[in-house]
């Protein structure tokens, strides 16, 4: 697929991400791929473009290696913060690992009635929670959703962790629903005994009772079920795959697309980064060899993903850091790069 112009043929999709800007119903956009392929640069640039056509945009990093702060040259944390130079684009960085202890320890401590409250279940419930595979990602993502739900953003862009973690991350609604259903089932069977034990030990923290906790857990389950439904709605959610033209990256991309399809999550855009476009008389043998290899995998991408919007991005001479360079990079996501020479 040529990146020198937007192709008008109805049988060929445009090599841009303009379709994401035009789809006004989108609320959740995930950007992911193998490590080191330019996910953060792509997600930041896409968020910048979205901010030009949407009222409010939130960019969230769920990658423990948080690069949003480095990309924009501005410190971000667990709370959403406006990005310098924008009045409708905010960012936040949340580590999806290791927050379950904090959630359980803080549940109900301040007496609020939010959906994540009431998780001071004692050692027995903590052991049960930790025994459920994937519950750490699930609980952490629920914390993200709690913060997101308390704010008002028209579209949310996720800069995700490398492929394997992201795929587990996207399973969280199912995992959490199963976990909460299991806890509810156990409470039905052992509720009286638990109440007796808890009563003998002075009850739960904050003076809560088991019924209140179960009620909050059911409320949380309903919230997760709603988000799960939205994630599987192609009008509201899509996943942008980022890769480079190499075997391992293409393999990871194909595996990710297969997994996303099995989760019923829409994906129809691929960004291929770090492409070489050597000049016609370039004498660099390494450049020529690498370009030859890249062309091979670009042809495979063209054959495999003919029904995808495939964006081809050049290898740049400088790092894409700071607002000005991100703005320039983002323009190439909607206006295809035109190399001086292309063999």
Swiss-Prot record:
GO terms for cellular component: GET complex. InterPro entries: Anion-transp_ATPase-like_dom, ATPase_ArsA/GET3, ATPase_ArsA/GET3_euk, P-loop_NTPase. It is found in: Cytoplasm; Endoplasmic reticulum. Its EC number is 3.6.-.-. Its main location: cytoplasm. ATP binds at residues 34-41, 246, 273. Zn(2+) binds at residues 284, 287. GO terms for biological process: cellular response to oxidative stress; pheromone-dependent signal transduction involved in conjugation with cellular fusion; post-translational protein targeting to endoplasmic reticulum membrane; response to heat; response to metal ion; retrograde vesicle-mediated transport, Golgi to endoplasmic reticulum; tail-anchored membrane protein insertion into ER membrane. GO terms for molecular function: ATP binding; ATP hydrolysis activity; guanyl-nucleotide exchange factor activity; identical protein binding; metal ion binding; protein folding chaperone; unfolded protein binding. ATPase required for the post-translational delivery of tail-anchored (TA) proteins to the endoplasmic reticulum. Recognizes and selectively binds the transmembrane domain of TA proteins in the cytosol. This complex then targets to the endoplasmic reticulum by membrane-bound receptors, where the tail-anchored protein is released for insertion. This process is regulated by ATP binding and hydrolysis. ATP binding drives the homodimer towards the closed dimer state, facilitating recognition of newly synthesized TA membrane proteins. ATP hydrolysis is required for insertion. NCBIfam families: GET3_arsA_TRC40 (TIGR00345). Homodimer. This is ATPase GET3.
């Amino acid at each position: 697929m040529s990146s020198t112009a937007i192709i008008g043929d109805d049988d060929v999709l445009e090599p841009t991400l303009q379709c994401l800007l035009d789809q006004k119903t989108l609320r959740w956009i995930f950007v992911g791929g193998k490590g080191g392929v330019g996910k953060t640069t792509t997600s930041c640039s896409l968020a910048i473009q979205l901010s030009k056509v949407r009222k409010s945009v939130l960019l969230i990093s769920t990658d423990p290696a948080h690069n949003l702060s480095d990309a924009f040259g501005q410190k971000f944390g667990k709370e959403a913060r406006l990005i310098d130079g924008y009045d409708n684009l905010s960012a936040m960085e949340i580590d999806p690992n290791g927050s379950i202890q904090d959630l359980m320890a803080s549940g109900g401590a301040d007496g609020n009635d939010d959906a994540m409250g009431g998780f001071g279940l004692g050692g027995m419930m903590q052991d049960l929670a930790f025994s459920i595979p994937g519950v750490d990602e699930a609980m952490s993502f629920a914390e993200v959703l709690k913060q997101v739900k308390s704010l008002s953003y028209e579209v949310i862009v996720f800069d995700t962790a490398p492929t394997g973690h992201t795929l587990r991350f996207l399973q969280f609604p199912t995992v959490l629903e199963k976990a909460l259903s299991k806890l509810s089932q156990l409470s039905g069977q052992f509720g009286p005994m638990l109440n007796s034990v808890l009563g003998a030990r002075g009850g739960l923290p904050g003076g809560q009772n088991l019924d209140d906790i179960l009620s909050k857990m059911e409320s949380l389950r309903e919230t997760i079920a709603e988000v799960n439904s939205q994630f599987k709605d192609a009008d509201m959610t899509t996943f942008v795959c980022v890769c480079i033209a190499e075997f391992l990256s293409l393999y990871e991309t194909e595996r990710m697309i297969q997994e996303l399809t099995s989760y019923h999550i829409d994906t129809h855009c691929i960004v291929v980064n770090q492409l070489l476009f050597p000049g016609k008389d370039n004498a660099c043998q390494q450049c020529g060899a690498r370009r030859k290899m890249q062309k091979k995998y670009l042809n495979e991408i063209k054959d495999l993903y003919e029904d995808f919007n495939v964006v081809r991005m050049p290898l740049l001479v400088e790092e894409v850091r700071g607002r000005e360079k991100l703005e320039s990079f983002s323009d190439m996501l909607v206006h295809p790069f035109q190399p001086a020479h292309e063999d």
